[in-house]
UniProtKB/Swiss-Prot annotation:
Bacitracin is thought to be involved in the inhibition of peptidoglycan synthesis by sequestering undecaprenyl diphosphate, thereby reducing the pool of lipid carrier available. It comes from Wigglesworthia glossinidia brevipalpis. This is Undecaprenyl-diphosphatase. Its EC number is 3.6.1.27. The lineage of its organism: Bacteria, Pseudomonadati, Pseudomonadota, Gammaproteobacteria, Enterobacterales. It catalyses: di-trans,octa-cis-undecaprenyl diphosphate + H2O = di-trans,octa-cis-undecaprenyl phosphate + phosphate + H(+). GO terms for cellular component: plasma membrane.
Length: 267
């Protein structure tokens, strides 16, 4: 019963934190140390329960996805060059983090400790605050079509930093994008698209690597995934509204607070 409760808590935390630049991995690993979960088990669970938010993101943006599919199906011979470039740039943005993730995933696991998480939470927060001040009073790019090839590539490359637990994929996307003069809501949507594009490949790799563990613990895996899916689906629309206009400084303060708690309680 205790194990089921912990898995549900992990799923709820994943479902909420995935929509904010506060590092879902950092929070899940903090819970690991609170409940004293085996390190190997928590890493397996963290990666697998991210399936939930992926499905919720697809459902939350289903109308836009449906329109895109309909457009391609009925207008295959009339696709505008600009749209093709946008899709190409989105795919290109996934490449840097995919390559580094596959090459160094073993090495990156060494950073899954409270000490490193707290350091990366603080460093990320400092960068978030700086990005808000750098982008102050600039006219923002408010459409995917206006984002240049170079800016797509820079944002995509910056995703590599989010491989470090505590940095936040969403946070690094928005902060780099703000510096590049892009609207924060456009960046939020872009980050969600990147997440739903990259994570399926990562999850396939994790299932392959941990097949026997997952097979033996399939009941807990299902509970964790369902918990994260339902939470992110219920909370997703509210999170989207919050992220439209909320400064990264608010989240940076929270991250520093969490980092201090981790430093003083988990080390």
């Amino acid at each position: 019963m205790k194990e089921i409760l912990i898995i549900i808590i992990l799923g709820i935390v994943e479902g909420i934190t995935e929509f904010f630049p506060i590092s879902s991995n950092g929070h899940l690993i903090l819970i690991n140390y609170i409940f004293n979960i085996d390190k190997e088990n928590i890493q397996n669970i963290i990666k697998i329960i991210q399936i939930g938010p992926i499905f919720s993101i697809i459902l939350l943006f289903k109308e836009k996805i449906k329109k895109s599919i309909t457009f391609f199906y009925f207008n295959i011979n009339n696709i505008k060059k600009k749209l093709i470039l946008i899709l190409f740039n989105l795919v290109l943005s996934c490449i840097p983090i995919s390559i580094l993730g596959f090459m160094f995933y073993k090495k990156l696991e060494e950073f899954y400790s409270p000490k490193y998480i707290s350091y990366f939470l603080i460093l990320g927060s400092i960068f978030f605050i700086l990005s808000e001040f750098i982008s102050l009073k600039k006219i923002k790019i408010d459409n995917f079509k206006k984002i240049s090839f170079l800016k797509y590539f820079i944002i995509g490359s910056s995703q590599c930093f989010s491989l470090l637990p505590g940095v936040s994929r969403l946070g690094i996307t928005i902060s780099i994008g703000l510096i590049l003069n892009i609207d924060r809501y456009v960046l939020f949507k872009f980050s969600m698209i990147l997440f739903s594009s990259i994570m399926p490949a990562v999850l396939i790799l994790e299932v392959y690597k941990n097949f026997f563990y997952l097979k033996e613990n399939i009941f807990f895996v299902i509970i964790g995934v369902m918990s994260s899916f339902l939470t992110s689906l219920i909370f997703g629309r509210t999170a989207i509204k919050i992220m439209k206009n909320t400064s990264l400084i608010i989240f940076a303060i929270y991250r520093i607070f969490i980092a201090c708690i981790i430093l003083f309680t988990c080390n």
